Amino acid sequence: MSRRVLVRFVLAVSIAAVLVAVGALPVGAADRPATDSPADSGVSGPRIVSVYPNPVADGDVGEFVVITVPPETDLGDYSLGDDETTVSLPNRTVSDRVVLSTAPNATAALLDDDPLRISDDLALANGGEPVVLSRNGTVIDRLNYTDAPSGELRVASGTARWRAVGATDRPVVTGTAGEVTVFALPDAPAVATDSLASADRRILFAGYTLTDEAVADELVAAADRNVTVRVLLDGDPVGGMTRRQATILDRLTDAGIDVNVLGGERARYDFHHAKYAIVDDRALVATENWKHAGLGGNGSRGWGVVTDQPRIVRALAETFRADTDWRDARPWSEYRTGESFQSAPAANETFPTEFRPRPVNVEETRLLVAPDNAESEILDIIGNATDTIDVEQVSIGGRRQPFVQATLAAARRGVSVRILLSSAWYTKEENQQLVDWLNERANRESLPLEARLAKPRGQFEKIHAKGVVVDGDQAIVGSLNWNAVHRLLYHQSNYCVWSRLETTRTATKNSTNMRWEPSRNKTRMGSIVFRRNRTAKICDCMLIPLLTA
């Protein structure tokens, strides 16, 4: 049964490098994800790590409980129970992580563990109950849960109480001082293709869609010169996959490139909305899709960052491997069998170059991954604003959206706020209603806040960026939109940039102010991330570089 919701996704959030940490890889990788297990080292006694009470399979076949134990633990001394039943654990000597299942074969199909069988007298309630671990009748640990979502784990620790099996729980990763290159679209499409063309060893390519032939040309050329190329895309984008993309993916596969798509019954995330590439020891993170209207430079206003900070690149590569090397990543040749594809024209407009790529010194960079860690980080950034907040978004999910509420709270404490939304036909009416409400609220409460719809004036076709600039020196660049769908359903990355140099601030400002006040050359540039919800997941990443002298 698919978890996808049709209205979810006008955006493209996945990859914004913003705050992400080296997190565990999915089950089956060298390091297991915190999805199923906290740190196993240093456990003073047996503990419940997670429970899986509501399997997707009919009849809830495959319920399991994960525990951790000290080395050489005699499991026969322990029992597991709920509100109705207590069952003895197998008489085995075990260490570290142990998976206990009423149907080991079904559980083994989800995990790389060798589950131990327990009596099926223990049936976990979907509506919730306590799960109790006891030793010789004495309770030593307890995990409570309510309203178990289908196919998700209740975890004892981490950033979310519920998580899809195999989903990651990555911490925020911070990079030290260095230099990044910031660029705007449609002004500088060559940054993306030139980055791919420079590859000597590897390209790890992540996206929501891929329909730009120029990008495909560089991927094939890289493979021809023996560069390792891996591609990961969403398997079921809103509106369906296009014939153009299917043709490109056939071509990449024929060139020997490893192409995978995410989706299917075991999908950990409703969408893979990332937009990034790791080229050798550099990472490119953008707000735009790999298509003509996006990174191809033929339409959308967007932002991007290129960095070679080792911690950031390494963490993003780990995220890529975690997303690619699990069971919901399907080879393109397998996925395309029996599929139908949609026709869609490619954007072909041209626009002037107003903003050229610029190198910027960074004091610090943080990588965020959604749904793992991005929401709380972004709320903290907005909550700590003292001077200004500039927001540029395709759309916003409504008046009660958490980032909107945090921004209103900032305005109430005297922070000057500007919000610029897309005027594209598919979101204009909804955005205008929100703009009117925000301005009315600002007028009624005498808040330093103003909201507008963008007027492209020939500089671009539409806003597709997802950006926030705080206090003039911190920008978030990534694929996360400020709408409810993206907060709840996608996997993404984001990159946050902070600059205390006037020249650096100029580099990150021009793109927004040119749309806010055409007579003044003061635009800010940035992009934001999204939030995680227990019932819906979207894969995104974001980068937050703190730029300074």
Summary of predicted features, one role per range:
Residues 23-50, 56, 152-255, 270-272, ...:
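Charged, low-complexity intrinsically disordered terminal segments
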Residues 58-61, 86-157, 463-465:
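Solvent-exposed beta-edge/loop recognition patches
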Residues 1-13:
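N-terminal Sec-pathway targeting helices
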Residues 74-85, 143, 285-288, 476-480:
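Catalytic Cys-His active-site segments of thiol-dependent hydrolases/isopeptidases
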Residues 12-20:
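Bacterial N-terminal signal peptides
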Residues 27-85, 123-125, 147, 174:
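A structural motif detector for short, solvent-exposed N-terminal "entry" segments of globular domains
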Residues 51, 81-91, 111-120, 232-234, ...:
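N-terminal post-signal-peptidase region of extra-cytosolic proteins
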Residues 71-72, 91, 105, 112, ...:
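N-linked glycosylation sites
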